Amino acid sequence: MAGGGHRPVVGTLHLLLLVAALPWASRGVSPSAAAWPEEKNYHQPAILNSSALRQIAEGTSISEMWRNDLQPLLIERYPGSPGSYAARQHIMQRIQRLQADWVLEIDTFLSQTPYGYRSFSNIISTLNPTAKRHLVLACHYDSKYFSHWDNRVFVGATDSAVPCAMMLELARALDKKLLSLKTVSDSKPDLSLQLIFFDGEEAFLHWSPQDSLYGSRHLAAKMASTPHPPGARGTSQLHGMDLLVLLDLIGAPNPMFPNFFPNSARWFERLQAIEHELHELGLLKDHSLERRYFQNYSYGGVIQDDHIPFLRRGVPILHLIPSPFPEVWHTMDDNEENLDESTIDNLNKILQVFVLEYLHL
């Protein structure tokens, strides 16, 4: 995570929210070209009934996720390290084995760091890249570089191995339903799903605009200059982002997620409603509504994280990061031993329901 810690960018919050709220036409997009990018502003979820919720809860497996997705990522994986390559290969292989016909892209680039030029590689996995609109789930797969201490290495379990594993489990558990996006009668559905695994979120030395967010800064600029749909004039891949849902620092017990952005509040409220429904159906483990995950308060600033380069370009953001941060943040204790299985399992169910409702599956 969020190498900026709890330093909010209060001074720029109002400017960033203003940019995010601007209609595309005021940013140089012609009215005709802006028609489909505006559809996200009116999009409504298809609310699932209790039978469907039970089916989703039964279809996700925390033990399978733990063994097959998470544990291989609990290694040192700072950019350019052997562990970074291993993590990247693991993520790609887990996606390639699925039936839903994901299209994988590796965005590799060089960037100056405090240690000279380093290579970074973002992983972009997209269902139906030609679909105009995509719901985007994202996290970072790099771990922060720390010197070894007492033969221990920093594996960043919450930061952000667990979010990566949650996204992989979502793709596995919903594979058959996501496959239907490719096989619907309309050969090119208007709305689909994209997963982004950022490299280089963490600072090598001290968090700064230059030493942080390497992967997201590069990818946001690249997507802003890439026409979408292919050959379009006036709209880019960023216009095709309905909502960027960024997961970070997840896996510790009793997380509390505030709402960060007013323009995505209705989607945050949907997460609250899903959490409540799953609780009422008895589908959440060790869960109390008195200490629910998605809280009824707004955060008075912006936490520095991979959403920032996209926020500045007007992409709607749903930032799923707890406040306060886990106690183990940026310590050697951010490891498997200190993860809470029930919390992760519950959040898996909530996120999977959210995605299916958003995509009308």
Predicted stretch roles:
Residues 1-361:
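Secretory-pathway/membrane protein signature
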